[in-house]
Amino acid sequence: MPGKSSLEWHRHYRDRREELEDFWGRRASAPNLRARYRVFGASVSMASNHECAAAAFELSHPQFSQVPGNADDLPGYELQFAVDPGRETTDVPDDLSTHMRRFGGGDWLLIDAGIWGSAHIDLRARTAHFILSPALARRPDLISSCMNTVILNLFIGSAGAGMLHASCLLKEGGERMLLMMAPHNTGKSTTALRLVQAGYRLLTDSMVFVRETSAGTQLLGFPVGRIKLRADVRREVVAANAAIEEWLEPEEVRSETKHSLDLRRYRPECVQSEAVLVPPCVDLCLLERTGKLETTLRPALAQTVMEAVVANSLYCDRDEVWLPNLELLSRLVEGADCFHLAAGTDVASLVGVIEGMGERP
């Protein structure tokens, strides 16, 4: 009878399934470790066949602003890691990021780390699949910095959060916020460190995410409390305070070795770890370095600021992602007091000019 035959084949398949050739490596890559995290309040599910994924997440997770409670109304993300034991390679170089290539088409992205691994991302499904060599599995720090955090930031933007490439600092009990935008290597991080030393709290020195919540416009940072200094600035900072040198760690950034200062470890009281709502007073500065002694300030048009946002914060992506995000950023800019800040070399002048912005009516 047809029904009986069907049942026999089902039984035969179940009995022989584990003997079938693992042509696609599904059996070898099947996860046996699972964990769940919260990133900006959204759920992130992690599955892996190797403990390196959990180790990488322990490095990635604290770099995102904490959000009180759970944002279960936000879409969740899934990341699956598979270490291929047959893909043994040479050791992974510390400057792995300079060896990586990125490709994109539609909702699919690929991060290619050559012989050491790759990550395939489906933005619409909010999933990422990592294939790693054992050598890369031994470097959870590089998995975190070159893959994990990059992909999580992509998902956050695709979920509707606008992003500014800016430093964000707070003062006066959080009632005053300073945002500083500048191209790479033009003094933004140096200025941020000087303001931290003058009593400001740092949310982030790199990426400020903006999203609307029922309580108001929320700002979140990545990486939280971390400042990256050029080699010449490092020498200047260490000359002024030798004790800071032990807290500086070399890090490859855009084919350049910078020195990262994690304020969460060095001076945790100077870090704004939790996400914040936009306060009543927001100063947004387009920063430039002049080499002169004195710092000067002049008003900036919101249109000029938005042009800088497009130039410094965006990369080629789909219009359906960027246009709503830019609308969010535009509302933030229009509600801020905008300036051109020409940062001088005299610290007292710099701090004095910035403090003066908060004394206006």
Regions found by a protein language model. Give the residues of each.
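Conserved lysine of the Walker
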Residues: K188
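A noncatalytic interaction/capping subdomain that flanks phosphate/NTP-handling catalytic cores
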Residues: M1-H184, L193, Q197-R201, V208-P361
